[in-house]
Amino acid sequence: MATLPPTANPSQQPLNLEDEDGILDEYDQYSLAHPCVVGGGRKGRTKREAAANTNRPSPGGHERKLLTKFQNSERKKAWR
């Protein structure tokens, strides 16, 4: 199995932090300084925002379904 020779070209050597400052713009530096939190499968929202904007079932049961049934039965009674 052939091995590749180490890179001797200075342009292919890994950069130091001092060298990166000239290459990276302010957005790249911000993204490196503030990494994303692991477990961010929440559409880019925090847990609090996701909880506030999520349709959760109400603990009281199916109020909307019961209300619709009641309204429909009242309409049928009015037609008779």
From Swiss-Prot:
What does the record note about the induction of this protein?
Transiently induced in G1 phase. Activated in fibroblasts during growth arrest. Rapidly induced in response to adriamycin-induced apoptosis. Inhibited by TP53. Up-regulated during cuprizone-induced inflammation and demyelination.
What is one cellular component GO term in this UniProt entry? nucleoplasm
Which GO molecular function annotations are given, in alphabetical order? acetyltransferase activator activity; chromatin binding; DNA binding; transcription coactivator activity
Compartment(s) of residence: Nucleus; Cytoplasm; Cytoplasm, Perinuclear region
So which domain of life are we looking at? Eukaryota
Write out the similarity annotation.
Belongs to the NUPR family.
What gene name is given for the protein in this entry?
A: Nupr1
Effect of inactivating the gene: Knockout NUPR1 mice are viable and seem normal. Mouse embryonic fibroblast grown more rapidly compared to wild type. Knockout NUPR1 mice are fertile. However female present a delay in female sexual maturation and male develop a phenotype similar to Sertoli-cell-only syndrome (SCOS).
Name of the featured protein: Nuclear protein 1
| Subunit record text | Monomer. Directly interacts with MSL1 and binds MORF4L1, two components of histone acetyltransferase complex; the interaction with MORF4L1 may be mediated by MSL1. Interacts with EP300; this interaction enhances the effect of EP300 on PAX2 transcription factor activity. Interacts with PAXIP1; this interaction prevents PAXIP1 inhibition of PAX2 transcription factor activity. Interacts with COPS5; this interaction allows COPS5-dependent CDKN1B nuclear to cytoplasm translocation. Interacts with RNF2. Interacts with FOXO3; this interaction represses FOXO3 transactivation.
What Pfam family does this protein match (any one)? Phospho_p8
Outline what the protein does: Transcription regulator that converts stress signals into a program of gene expression that empowers cells with resistance to the stress induced by a change in their microenvironment. Thereby participates in the regulation of many processes namely cell-cycle, apoptosis, autophagy and DNA repair responses. Controls cell cycle progression and protects cells from genotoxic stress induced by doxorubicin through the complex formation with TP53 and EP300 that binds CDKN1A promoter leading to transcriptional induction of CDKN1A.
Q: Which InterPro entries match?
A: NUPR1-like
Q: Where is this region: Disordered?
A: 1-21, 38-80
Please indicate the residue ranges that the annotation assigns to the motif Nuclear localization signal.
Answer: 64-80
Q: TM spans, by residue?
A: none
Keywords, ordered alphabetically: Activator, Cytoplasm, DNA-binding, Nucleus, Phosphoprotein, Transcription, Transcription regulation
Basic and acidic residues composition bias: which ranges?
A: 61-80
